[in-house]
Amino acid sequence: MKLWLWVAVGVWMLMAELGTIETAPRRDGTRPSVSGARPQQVVNRLFFDYPDSDRASLLAVARFIGEKPITFVKTDSSPGLFQNILVGTLVVAFFFLLFQFCLHVNFQKGA
């Protein structure tokens, strides 16, 4: 890159750090680009703050946005077997890597 380009980037970064130029528009300082446009509507947060177990609210929101709701049925099988297999695999992998490390490391001084 040429020196003048680096100088321009440095000046721009300095001005952005000092606050003399805006790097992104602020919400309260923006105006609508079309005359007669309404300001942005505030989203009602309480409508969206619902627990995942509230099936009626989930179905209502799914219908509102036009999705086909998917419901998952909890089965009687416990995740204990899968969790035991996963933890056992991770432990075996850890000891295998530790064994490989100890096998290839030479603890003698000098080389």
UniProtKB/Swiss-Prot annotation:
Q: Which GO terms describe its cellular component?
A: extracellular region; plasma membrane
| Protein keywords | Cell membrane, Fertilization, Membrane, Secreted, Signal, Transmembrane, Transmembrane helix
Which cysteines does the record link by disulfide bonds?
none
GO BP annotations listed: fertilization; fusion of sperm to egg plasma membrane involved in single fertilization
Q: Which residues form the signal peptide?
A: 1-23
Tissues with expression: Testis-specific.
Q: Null phenotype? A: Deficient mice have no overt developmental abnormalities. Furthermore, no deleterious effects on testicular histology and sperm morphology are observed. However male mice are severely subfertile, their spermatozoa show impaired ability to fuse with the oocytes.
Q: Which residues cross the membrane?
A: 85-105
Q: Which PANTHER family does the entry link to?
A: FERTILIZATION-INFLUENCING MEMBRANE PROTEIN, RIKEN CDNA 4930451I11 GENE
Q: What is this protein called?
A: Fertilization-influencing membrane protein
In its UniProt entry, the species of origin is given as: Mus musculus
Highest lineage ranks of the organism?
Eukaryota, Metazoa, Chordata, Craniata, Vertebrata
